[in-house]
């Protein structure tokens, strides 16, 4: 009895410590973006609502009420309580939700594909704005802490961001352990600052009543809608709760949000409101005005650390999203480097890193202040949230087995709120919202071109390909010279003869004693169980088909996967195996079915793709590349 009790207690202790470890980790990673919103969200919303006039009591209460109920409806109800339950084998995020929706429908839906692509593309646009506005708003505290350094705000921001992107290739494993404690300190500071200032005017707590939010919107017309676009700054980052589901799990994220992060944010926002009610001039920078001059510099340092952590989380999210898009066939194979031997999810994509850095630098140098940049912020996130809501309807309807009317009744209120925020942000189109839309549109065109070009290329290739069964039958009747060893031919179509095999027969006039037609597939799930990794089919004495399946969040490692095939009876020895890979040289054609500019874009994307050898982690010394020229 004692031994059993001790064992059970030990397991519970380990389970409890694991839960709190994940909760602390989620505070350090998941909530960085939304957690740094108090730096600018209330200020921008109140100034926008005042419309050049002094900030009145009704404006402060209206803005606070809008922020509070937006956090309750969009983040708490929609993401924390609803969508966190719509996981794809434990994973979340826009592309994961898209794959889950398609699996629920039992077919590929172009509408869901379009929603997923648009949502993911806008996330990339957001990945450029978040580091720019977050770090810029933190460093702007220098204007109050050391007015003489005001002219160095932009250069210092640029320096911090360049260093941040420069160290990405080294990985973040060593410093990531500090993220949780730093962000806990940040949220505790937010709460303490808020508690201190709520006493300036406790009547600010009246804003809990949604009457003030509704009254503000009804009495301010277009200005109210514009203000709503600024209020949305308080909920940006809410989508990250769902995107990081796979890293920390549902319960740790829910617990961290409901019992720590949300209370700290609300207390701080209400503290800023009370401060402005007692001193309207404080609206100029209501966040930094909450602390005495002596604490300004330490707060600037803490805020900068928090915004760097928030930026790091967004950058890592962009790497993960692009990696998923590559696995799902939405983008060409980008070079992926692994920055940790123990954590497979810690990756670095050099090309994506460079593009993000260029985008972030352009934003900082174009807008120069967080107030200017706030106009550009929001449109990308609101688009992603609308896409998540609509895809969520499909999951609730089909996967949770609810009637369409019930599923619509559950999700419709959230989609209506998201569309309202989207409309409000659209009003800022010419003030800067066009920037993330431009980034997102460029990403959509890139994905569309890659998908369309790949489909056209596959169609053209299949027209000239020879059926595999016909070739095998022909070779059995008239076999060529047989050489020892195993040849593995990579192909996307296991029913046709790989180009590399035809070239080997035509030019070398030999056939290996064992020939494997290898197909690599991506499942609609984040990961594939090892038992489902390999499927083998023997065609003849000399030919076999092998299919390897990977999840869209897995790194395809062919040699490791083929080692699993040994257990299925395949005598696989990598030292006597040659991998034959086809490399296509593409030429544009006026008959391709795409405009010429799209032909050239597709060819450029194809040339920039990482070669199959590196992407599938095949030993370079065992690879034979066969070049072919194809006109699109």
Curated annotation (Swiss-Prot):
Transport of potassium into the cell. Likely operates as a K(+):H(+) symporter. Belongs to the HAK/KUP transporter (TC 2.A.72) family. The chain crosses the membrane at residues 19-39, 58-78, 110-130, 147-167, 178-198, 216-236, 257-277, 290-310, 347-367, 377-397, 404-424, 429-449. It is found in: Cell inner membrane. Pfam families: K_trans (PF02705), K_trans_C (PF22776). Keywords: Cell inner membrane, Cell membrane, Ion transport, Membrane, Potassium, Potassium transport, Symport, Transmembrane, Transmembrane helix, Transport. It is a multi-pass membrane protein. It comes from Bradyrhizobium sp. (strain ORS 278). It catalyses: K(+)(in) + H(+)(in) = K(+)(out) + H(+)(out). This is Probable potassium transport system protein Kup 3. One of its GO terms (molecular function) is symporter activity. InterPro entries: K+_transporter, K_trans_C, K_trans_N, Kup. PANTHER family: LOW AFFINITY POTASSIUM TRANSPORT SYSTEM PROTEIN KUP, OSMOTIC STRESS POTASSIUM TRANSPORTER. GO terms for cellular component: plasma membrane.
């Amino acid at each position: 009895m004692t031994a059993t009790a001790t064992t059970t207690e030990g397991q519970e202790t380990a389970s409890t410590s694991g839960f709190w470890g994940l909760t602390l980790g989620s505070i350090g990673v998941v909530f960085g973006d939304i957690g740094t919103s108090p730096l600018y969200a209330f200020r921008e919303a109140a100034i926008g609502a005042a419309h050049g006039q002094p900030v009145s009591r009704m404006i402060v209460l209206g803005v606070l009420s809008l922020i509070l109920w937006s956090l309750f409806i969009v983040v708490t109800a929609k993401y924390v309580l609803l969508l966190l339950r719509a996981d794809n084998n434990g994973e979340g995020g826009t592309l994961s939700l898209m794959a889950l929706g398609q699996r629920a429908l039992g077919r590929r839906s172009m509408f869901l594909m379009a929603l997923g692509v648009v949502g993911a593309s806008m996330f990339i646009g957001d990945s450029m704005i978040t580091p720019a506005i977050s770090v810029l708003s933190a460093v702007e505290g220098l204007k109050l802490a050391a007015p003489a350094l005001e002219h160095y705000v932009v250069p210092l921001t640029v320096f911090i961001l360049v260093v941040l992107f420069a160290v990405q290739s080294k990985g973040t494993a060593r410093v990531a352990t500090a993220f949780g404690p730093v962000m806990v300190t940040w949220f505790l500071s937010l709460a303490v600052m808020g508690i201190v200032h709520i006493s300036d005017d406790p009547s600010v707590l009246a804003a809990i009543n949604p009457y003030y939010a509704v009254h503000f919107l009804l009495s301010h017309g277009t200005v109210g809608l514009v203000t709503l676009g600024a209020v949305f700054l308080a909920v940006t980052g809410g989508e990250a709760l769902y995107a990081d589901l796979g890293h920390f799990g549902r319960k740790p994220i829910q617990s961290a949000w409901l019992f720590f992060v949300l209370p700290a944010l609300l207390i701080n926002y209400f503290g800023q409101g009370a401060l402005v009610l007692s001193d309207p001039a404080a609206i100029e920078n209501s966040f930094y005005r909450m602390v005495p001059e002596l604490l300004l510099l330490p707060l600037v340092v803490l805020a900068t650390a928090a915004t760097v952590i928030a930026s790091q989380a967004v950058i890592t999210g962009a790497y993960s999203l692009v990696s998923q898009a590559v696995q799902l066939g939405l983008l060409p194979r980008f070079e992926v480097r692994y920055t940790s031997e123990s954590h497979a999810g810690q990756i670095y994509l050099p090309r994506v890193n460079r593009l993000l850095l260029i985008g972030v630098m352009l934003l900082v140098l174009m807008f120069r202040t967080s107030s200017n940049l706030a106009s550009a912020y929001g449109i990308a996130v609101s688009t992603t949230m609308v896409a998540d809501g609509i895809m969520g309807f499909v999951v609730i309807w089909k996967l949770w087995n609810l009637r369409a009317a019930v599923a619509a009744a559950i999700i419709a209120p959230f989609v209506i709120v998201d569309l309202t925020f989207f409309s409000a942000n659209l009003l800022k189109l010419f003030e800067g919202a066009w920037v993330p839309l431009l980034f997102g549109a460029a990403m959509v065109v890139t994905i569309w071109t890659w998908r369309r070009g790949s489909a056209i290329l596959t169609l053209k290739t299949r027209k000239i390909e020879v059926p595999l069964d016909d070739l095998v039958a022909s070779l059995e009747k008239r076999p060529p010279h047989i050489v020892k060893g195993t040849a593995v031919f990579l192909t996307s179509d296991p029913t046709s003869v790989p180009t590399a095999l035809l070239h080997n027969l035509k030019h070398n006039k030999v056939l290996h004693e064992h020939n494997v037609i290898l197909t690599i597939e991506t499942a609609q799930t984040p990961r594939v169980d090892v038992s489902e990794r390999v499927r083998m089919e023997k065609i003849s004495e000399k030919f076999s088909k092998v299919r390897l399946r990977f999840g869209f969040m897995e790194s395809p490692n062919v040699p490791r996967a083929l080692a699993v095939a040994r257990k299925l009876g395949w005598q696989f020895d990598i030292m006597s195996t040659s991998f034959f890979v086809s490399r296509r040289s593409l030429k544009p054609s006026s008959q391709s079915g795409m405009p010429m500019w799209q032909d050239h874009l597709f060819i450029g994307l194809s040339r920039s793709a990482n070669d199959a050898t590196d992407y599938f982690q095949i030993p370079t010394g065992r690879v034979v590349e066969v070049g072919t020229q194809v006109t699109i």
